[in-house]
Amino acid sequence: MKEIERRCLRALIGIVQNIYDQMKAGQVPELHIATRTKYNIEFNEESEVWVYGDRKSVRSAKTVKGAYRILKMTYVIGFLKEQLNLNKSSTLRELYYISEGWGAAKFEEQPESDRLVEDLEILTNFQREHFHIRPEEDGATVIGPLRVREETRRGVREIHCQDDVGEGGYQIPVNVDKIEFVDHDAKFVIAIETGGMRDRLVENGFDEKYDAIIVHLKGQPARSTRRLLRRLNTELNLPVVVFTDGDPWSYRIFASVAYGSIKSAHLSEYLATPAAQFVGIRPTDIVKYDLPADKLTEEDIKALNAILTDPRFDSEFWKKEVNLQLEINKKSEQQALAKYGLDYVTDVYLPERLSELGVI
């Protein structure tokens, strides 16, 4: 067992020890965990990311619901202890199904077990990967002038993310910290929400023309994708820009990359890239380019109003853009730029926006 895994195991056992000590002292056991809401995140000046504040939620056995939560946590810790000792791993989905045999500690649905794993991350200051818990989702793909070194079952190999891959690109592994950056000729990184737009840039040779590393986000990005973007920015000193659809859900995708997500604010210093810049699609672009658009739904309007009270978006840029979007009552997709031809996005829109941002 690696040293970091030994420390992780000690931290997990420490939680159970704390519960036991409270019960031995005749106390009702309880745990205090950071509240995971937008009202409990604060800006860390040193790391420039959003992290949890001082508000705590109490998991107490005083209530039946609280007692079940603590019971389920002890079962999960017991499972993780065995898994670490055997050097095995499991997925979040497998953990949910394994609980079928735990009687009263069985999870009713997977989101419940997922949240409990997040609780353990917060309580121990370790990541789920240190518990040997893997996500279901794959990491996204990368294509561009970057050479990486990775360990495989057959040993160490080097891969050039342009020359040694097909149009699908290089698959980002679950544990990004296991890959090493060997060298690169890149000038910036562009993270793209949709597969269709990612394919358009690749087909048009955008990565070659502008020495860009293209990262496909696949919608809301996996942790591995966000970790890769942070490493490319901090270790290789490459500017990172994010290109999404023009709707509130896509702005949240940008926020998870740049500021850190509310759900995983305990990992913001590891996953977030505060230097990341938003390319578009902006509401300003919808008006400026007269893009094909859909009317905002009630859910869209509700989400936009929520953004106006989200501290991560507390800037003049976002206030102006969100208020404009509410005013025009429209949203547009990235691919709406095809109104002006398939090459417009790579020949006109992106060069103009990247020049405005000082990237090219």
From Swiss-Prot:
<dbReference type="InterPro" id="IPR013049">
    <property type="entry name" value="Spo11/TopoVI_A_N"/>
</dbReference>
<dbReference type="InterPro" id="IPR049333">
    <property type="entry name" value="Topo_VI_alpha"/>
</dbReference>
<keyword id="KW-0067">ATP-binding</keyword>
<protein>
    <recommendedName>
        <fullName>Type 2 DNA topoisomerase 6 subunit A</fullName>
        <ecNumber>5.6.2.2</ecNumber>
    </recommendedName>
</protein>
<dbReference type="Pfam" id="PF20768">
    <property type="entry name" value="Topo_VI_alpha"/>
</dbReference>
<feature type="binding site">
    <location>
        <position position="245"/>
    </location>
    <ligand>
        <name>Mg(2+)</name>
    </ligand>
</feature>
<keyword id="KW-0413">Isomerase</keyword>
<dbReference type="InterPro" id="IPR004085">
    <property type="entry name" value="TopoVI_A"/>
</dbReference>
<keyword id="KW-0238">DNA-binding</keyword>
<dbReference type="Pfam" id="PF21180">
    <property type="entry name" value="TOP6A-Spo11_Toprim"/>
</dbReference>
<comment type="function">
    <text>Relaxes both positive and negative superturns and exhibits a strong decatenase activity.</text>
</comment>
<dbReference type="InterPro" id="IPR002815">
    <property type="entry name" value="Spo11/TopoVI_A"/>
</dbReference>
<dbReference type="GO" id="GO:0003677">
    <property type="term" value="F:DNA binding"/>
</dbReference>
<keyword id="KW-0460">Magnesium</keyword>
<dbReference type="GO" id="GO:0003918">
    <property type="term" value="F:DNA topoisomerase type II (double strand cut, ATP-hydrolyzing) activity"/>
</dbReference>
<dbReference type="GO" id="GO:0006265">
    <property type="term" value="P:DNA topological change"/>
</dbReference>
<dbReference type="InterPro" id="IPR036078">
    <property type="entry name" value="Spo11/TopoVI_A_sf"/>
</dbReference>
<feature type="active site" description="O-(5'-phospho-DNA)-tyrosine intermediate">
    <location>
        <position position="97"/>
    </location>
</feature>
<comment type="subunit">
    <text>Homodimer. Heterotetramer of two Top6A and two Top6B chains.</text>
</comment>
<dbReference type="InterPro" id="IPR036388">
    <property type="entry name" value="WH-like_DNA-bd_sf"/>
</dbReference>
<keyword id="KW-0799">Topoisomerase</keyword>
<dbReference type="GO" id="GO:0005694">
    <property type="term" value="C:chromosome"/>
</dbReference>
<keyword id="KW-0479">Metal-binding</keyword>
<feature type="binding site">
    <location>
        <position position="193"/>
    </location>
    <ligand>
        <name>Mg(2+)</name>
    </ligand>
</feature>
<comment type="similarity">
    <text>Belongs to the TOP6A family.</text>
</comment>
<dbReference type="GO" id="GO:0005524">
    <property type="term" value="F:ATP binding"/>
</dbReference>
<dbReference type="InterPro" id="IPR034136">
    <property type="entry name" value="TOPRIM_Topo6A/Spo11"/>
</dbReference>
<keyword id="KW-0547">Nucleotide-binding</keyword>
<dbReference type="GO" id="GO:0000287">
    <property type="term" value="F:magnesium ion binding"/>
</dbReference>
<feature type="domain" description="Topo IIA-type catalytic">
    <location>
        <begin position="3"/>
        <end position="140"/>
    </location>
</feature>
<dbReference type="Pfam" id="PF04406">
    <property type="entry name" value="TP6A_N"/>
</dbReference>
